[in-house]
């Protein structure tokens, strides 16, 4: 029997949330700190399942680190070069794409014998495009199904001319970019297809720059990385707040504010998901930006029809915010929802219908027509943290909502429901 949490109707949302560290930034920073020369102190590291999987993998690979008691500060002693193992290893990475993809590429730099595996859902998340790009020099075998983890990696990546499909996940390119400077030869990466989630590549390039490596590119179509380089620790690095996690609180304020301020991201943020606030503003919310905060106040929400490929994770929050808009909302160009923690397009359509919405699910879009009155329902979360957090917004109506398996938020935001309760005035 799955545990469940029933949220009673919320009359008002008001207050400030200090955001946990970004998952995307945390796992990239941990890997680069491990590869770099010198010790790096990471501040505001996210404490969640995905980060623990990366930390456990790095420990197995001989990386020393020291975590503070609350696990948000971490001193990482860099290896000054590739990750290697002197014995055969199996690394279990849960359902953490931000650990699986970058580690798969980084482990191709040395000559080890390492198996990367994870939960059942991880074995359904494609990795073939990354493996194809690496196979010019590296030896990689699929242990179960072609194009999917688990993988056996025995190294041998030297750089050179690579081609990678950019249309499924930007994490494949991120993985190649982070490994390439440590290859013996220069690397030139050509993108096939349309590059999805481009702002996530900007996060990668920003982090690499912080660790002393510059990448040149021609309009995100061809990337050039000099080989034979070493990452250098910046000494200290502050992980900014998670912009995807901010989306739930900002949307809640747009629907039932009051005013909510999220701190840890702002005008200078490296995360593309901060653009979520612009989408809310287009829908009618009132947004204020600071250097390290975003503030949202309630507005009459209008329907919207928009390409949201640039904010794939935060766009899910628009799908549930659409329940409170004046007319039908259409979210387009989101095929990559289908290869995330679950098939998010299918899951979102199924659960939105339960609360009374009329939903059209396309191959790469979703259309949501809000009901006159929301219906109380039990929401399946599909072991997907974002499904649980998105559907908490249903409680901003005059209807309670029951979230099944609420603990799945541990992937990125273990105390999400406590934070939501702290800002809520119940009806």
Curated annotation (Swiss-Prot):
Q: What is its main location?
A: cytoplasm
A Pfam cross-reference name: EPSP_synthase
Q: Does the keyword Mitochondrion apply?
A: no
Q: Reaction catalysed?
A: 3-phosphoshikimate + phosphoenolpyruvate = 5-O-(1-carboxyvinyl)-3-phosphoshikimate + phosphate
Top-level division of the source organism's lineage:
Bacteria
Q: Which UniProt keywords apply?
A: Amino-acid biosynthesis, Aromatic amino acid biosynthesis, Cytoplasm, Transferase
Q: What is its EC number?
A: 2.5.1.19
Signal sequence, start to end: none
The molecular function GO annotations come to: 3-phosphoshikimate 1-carboxyvinyltransferase activity
GO terms classed as biological process:
amino acid biosynthetic process; aromatic amino acid family biosynthetic process; chorismate biosynthetic process
Q: What class of enzyme is it?
A: transferase
The catalytic site is made up of 313
Q: Which cysteines are joined by disulfide bonds?
A: none
GO cellular component annotations, sorted alphabetically?
A: cytoplasm
Task: Provide the protein's localization.
Answer: Cytoplasm
Cytoplasm listed as a keyword: yes
Residues annotated for phosphoenolpyruvate binding in this entry? 23, 97, 125, 171, 344, 386, 411
**Subunit field text:** Monomer.
Entries under PANTHER family matching the protein: AROM/DEHYDROQUINATE SYNTHASE, PENTAFUNCTIONAL AROM POLYPEPTIDE
Extract the HAMAP family matched here. Answer: EPSP_synth
User: What is this protein's function per UniProt?
Assistant: Catalyzes the transfer of the enolpyruvyl moiety of phosphoenolpyruvate (PEP) to the 5-hydroxyl of shikimate-3-phosphate (S3P) to produce enolpyruvyl shikimate-3-phosphate and inorganic phosphate.
Q: What is this protein called?
A: 3-phosphoshikimate 1-carboxyvinyltransferase
């Amino acid at each position: 029997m799955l545990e469940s949490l029933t949220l009673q109707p919320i009359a008002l949302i008001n207050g400030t949330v200090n955001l946990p560290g970004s998952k995307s930034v945390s796992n990239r920073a941990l890997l680069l700190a491990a590869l770099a020369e010198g010790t790096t102190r990471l501040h505001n590291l996210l404490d969640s399942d995905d980060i623990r999987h990366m930390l456990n993998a790095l420990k197995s690979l001989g990386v020393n680190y020291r975590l503070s008691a609350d696990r948000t500060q971490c001193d990482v002693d860099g290896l000054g070069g590739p990750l290697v193992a002197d014995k055969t290893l199996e690394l279990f990475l849960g359902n953490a794409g931000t650990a699986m993809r970058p580690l798969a590429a980084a482990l191709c730099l040395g000559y080890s014998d390492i198996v990367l595996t994870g939960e059942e859902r991880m074995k359904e998340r494609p990795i073939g495009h990354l493996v194809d790009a690496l196979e010019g020099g590296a030896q990689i075998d699929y242990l179960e199904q072609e194009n999917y983890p688990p993988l056996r990696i025995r190294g041998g990546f030297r750089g050179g001319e690579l081609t990678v499909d950019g249309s499924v996940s930007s994490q494949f390119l991120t993985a190649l970019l982070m490994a390439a400077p440590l290859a013996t030869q220069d690397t030139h990466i050509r993108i096939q297809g349309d590059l999805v989630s481009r702002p996530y590549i900007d996060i990668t390039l920003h982090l690499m720059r912080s660790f002393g490596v510059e990448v040149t590119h021609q309009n995100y179509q061809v990337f050039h990385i000099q080989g034979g380089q070493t990452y250098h620790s910046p000494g200290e690095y502050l992980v900014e707040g998670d912009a995807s996690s901010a989306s739930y609180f900002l949307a809640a304020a747009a629907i039932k504010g009051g005013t909510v301020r999220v701190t840890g991201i702002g005008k200078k943020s490296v995360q593309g998901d901060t653009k979520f606030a612009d989408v809310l503003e287009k829908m009618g919310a009132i947004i204020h930006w600071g250097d390290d905060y975003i503030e949202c106040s309630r507005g009459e929400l209008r329907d919207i029809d928009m390409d949201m490929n640039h904010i794939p994770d935060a766009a899910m929050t628009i799908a549930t915010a659409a329940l409170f808009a004046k007319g039908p909302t259409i979210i387009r160009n989101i095929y990559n929802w289908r290869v995330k923690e679950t098939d998010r397009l299918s899951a979102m359509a199924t659960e939105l219908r339960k609360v009374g919405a009329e939903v059209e699910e396309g191959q790469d879009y979703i259309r949501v027509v809000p009901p006159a009155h929301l219906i109380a329902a039990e929401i399946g979360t599909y072991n997907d943290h974002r499904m649980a957090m998105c559907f908490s917004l249903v409680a901003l109506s005059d209807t309670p909502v029951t979230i099944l398996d609420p603990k799945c938020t541990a992937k990125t935001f273990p105390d999400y429901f406590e934070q939501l309760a702290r800002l809520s005035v119940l009806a």
